[in-house]
């Protein structure tokens, strides 16, 4: 096999999506699979970690602007801590990795390797909170968690260990905690839409699929080109259950002891999986300029007699872009031809290529090529910074528009069971259906076609009824605040599975 053949992508995104994805991840130098005997673990290479750092920077800035402070809590959680919240134990027990021995000595109490941190953070919130003056309290940690999932692993989508952030807050009232829940959900939506060029749907998880111990789990869902949904991030209103279990109380203005309302919210490197899957093509990785390690690659094209002049011009352009804060790479290697360089940088996903040959050097121009579609733009040297920045916006808009078209054209409605099964089987995507709210009806569809309810819409019907003083009333999954996804008209509707009256709109989809 020649070097050019080895460099390129050999699988088809449309026909062999799984193999194509794995090939892009490895050949674009994003990750390697872990050591033999450690199925489900990956080695994150610098290019992928750089993507994660840009996601981290984007979110961390917004968290801090809205009162969040970073902290770090232990990797290990005593078994007794987990057992204090029954639903956490039941929800995560099959996925928990346990430490039972240190050196040659058996531990007195097993330690869970962090699957999530509510049970180790809540006891400290209890210590730190004494009065209403200590509220709201907001902490976040950037860390990794381990969930020993039995399902097939896929780099960045499903791995036993993964990077994420998890935020945890405590509030005096249900209304404040719910506002926090939605604030973080909106920040996650912005991360996908304004940083990663991926449109998402906002909704809530059905009652049986919410986070263990949560009152309400909200979600942003992204649709991949193969018609499967990705849970992009979740934000949980935990009510008072965790606060009751861990004694998170505060003294109110009237000296009354009250139970706090808590939230937790997280986004993992699954966002990178969605980024890779959404935009990349059969030539390799495609990245928006917002997160690309190199936003522009300059490829000089010369003959022996023009080399010095072309390189001098290219270096001047590179310095100009670098001074403007643009991430630029000048590929002046002389052991590879321009065609090889074009293919290599396309594979690595650089959004904009600048070609500079003798003609450009003579005429005072730069030829700019868009990575997504190969569109060519001639830029004046004197306006190169402004033009490059304009082309960044153009590339981002192209990527978002393509992803938005995929999403909008793949939301369908089914009013019968046969329509639901046929639509998912033929098209994939999201199928909106009337649903009675019974988990058994979802299970029947899941058993037949491996599709599940990924979300139900959030509406504003009962938002005004949120009581800021009632500590025990939960938030209804369907009727809390406005969302960008609307319910079907369920007047006289029946569930597509059991024909009982329908009370909810369910979004069915296959998912990662």
Curated annotation (Swiss-Prot):
It catalyses: tRNA(Pro) + L-proline + ATP = L-prolyl-tRNA(Pro) + AMP + diphosphate. InterPro entries: aa-tRNA-synt_IIb, aa-tRNA-synth_II, aa-tRNA-synth_II/BPL/LPL, Anticodon-bd, Anticodon-bd_dom_sf, Pro-tRNA-ligase_IIa, Pro-tRNA-ligase_IIa_arc-type, Pro-tRNA_ligase_II_C. Its main location: cytoplasm. GO terms for cellular component: aminoacyl-tRNA synthetase multienzyme complex; cytoplasm. Residues 460-470 have a biased composition (Acidic residues). Keywords: Aminoacyl-tRNA synthetase, ATP-binding, Cytoplasm, Ligase, Nucleotide-binding, Protein biosynthesis. Its EC number is 6.1.1.15. It is found in: Cytoplasm. It comes from the Archaea. GO terms for biological process: prolyl-tRNA aminoacylation. It holds the Pfam family tRNA-synt_2b. Residues 460-484 are annotated as: Disordered. One of its GO terms (molecular function) is ATP binding. Homodimer. Belongs to the class-II aminoacyl-tRNA synthetase family. ProS type 3 subfamily. Consists of three domains: the N-terminal catalytic domain, the anticodon-binding domain and the C-terminal extension. Catalyzes the attachment of proline to tRNA(Pro) in a two-step reaction: proline is first activated by ATP to form Pro-AMP and then transferred to the acceptor end of tRNA(Pro). NCBIfam families: proS_fam_I. This is Proline--tRNA ligase. The gene is proS.
């Amino acid at each position: 096999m020649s070097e050019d053949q080895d460099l390129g992508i050999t699988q088809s995104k449309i026909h062999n999506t799984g193999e194509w994805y794995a090939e892009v991840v490895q050949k674009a130098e994003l990750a390697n699979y872990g050591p033999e005997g450690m199925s489900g673990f990956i080695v994150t290479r610098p290019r992928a970690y750089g993507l994660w750092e840009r996601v981290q920077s984007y979110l961390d800035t917004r968290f801090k602007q809205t009162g969040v402070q970073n902290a770090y809590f232990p990797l290990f959680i005593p078994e007794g801590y987990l057992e204090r919240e029954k639903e956490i134990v039941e929800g995560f027990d099959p996925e928990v990795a346990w430490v039972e021995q240190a050196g040659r000595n058996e531990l007195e109490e097993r330690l869970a390797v962090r699957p999530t941190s509510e049970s180790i953070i809540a006891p400290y919130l209890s210590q730190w909170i004494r009065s209403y003056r200590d509220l709201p309290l907001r902490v976040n940690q950037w860390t990794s968690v381990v969930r020993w999932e039995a399902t097939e692993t896929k780099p960045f989508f499903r791995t036993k260990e993964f990077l994420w952030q998890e935020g945890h807050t405590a509030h005096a009232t249900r209304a404040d905690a719910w506002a926090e829940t939605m604030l973080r959900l909106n920040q996650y939506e912005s991360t996908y839409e304004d940083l990663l060029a991926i449109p998402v749907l906002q909704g809530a998880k059905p009652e049986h699929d919410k986070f263990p111990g949560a009152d309400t789990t909200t979600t942003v869902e992204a649709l991949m080109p193969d018609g499967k949904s990705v849970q992009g991030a979740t934000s949980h209103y935990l009510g008072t259950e965790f606060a009751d279990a861990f004694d998170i109380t505060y003294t109110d203005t009237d000296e009354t002891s009250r139970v706090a309302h808590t939230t937790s919210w997280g986004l993992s490197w699954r966002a990178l999986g969605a980024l890779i899957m959404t935009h990349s093509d059969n030539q390799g990785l495609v990245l928006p300029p917002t997160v690309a390690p190199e936003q522009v690659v300059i490829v000089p094209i010369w003959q022996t007699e023009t080399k010095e002049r072309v390189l001098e011009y290219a270096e001047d352009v590179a310095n100009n872009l670098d001074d403007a804060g643009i991430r630029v790479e000048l590929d002046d290697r002389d052991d590879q031809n321009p065609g090889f360089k074009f293919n290599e940088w396309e594979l690595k996903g650089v959004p904009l290529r600048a070609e500079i040959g003798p003609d450009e050097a003579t005429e005072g121009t730069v030829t700019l090529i868009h990575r997504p579609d190969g569109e060519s733009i001639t830029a004046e040297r004197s306006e190169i910074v402004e033009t490059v920045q304009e082309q960044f916006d153009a590339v981002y808009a192209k990527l978002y528009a393509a992803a938005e078209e995929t999403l909008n054209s793949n939301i369908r409605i089914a009013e019968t069971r046969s329509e639901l099964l046929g639509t998912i089987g033929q098209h994939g995507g999201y199928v909106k259906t009337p649903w009675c709210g019974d988990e058994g009806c979802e299970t029947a569809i899941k058993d037949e076609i491996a599709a599940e309810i990924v979300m139900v819409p959030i509406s504003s019907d009962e938002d005004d009824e949120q009581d800021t003083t009632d500590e025990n009333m939960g938030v209804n999954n369907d009727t809390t605040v406005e969302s960008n996804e609307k319910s079907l008209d369920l007047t006289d509707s029946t569930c597509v599975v059991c024909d009982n009256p329908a009370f909810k709109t369910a979004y069915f989809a296959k998912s990662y």
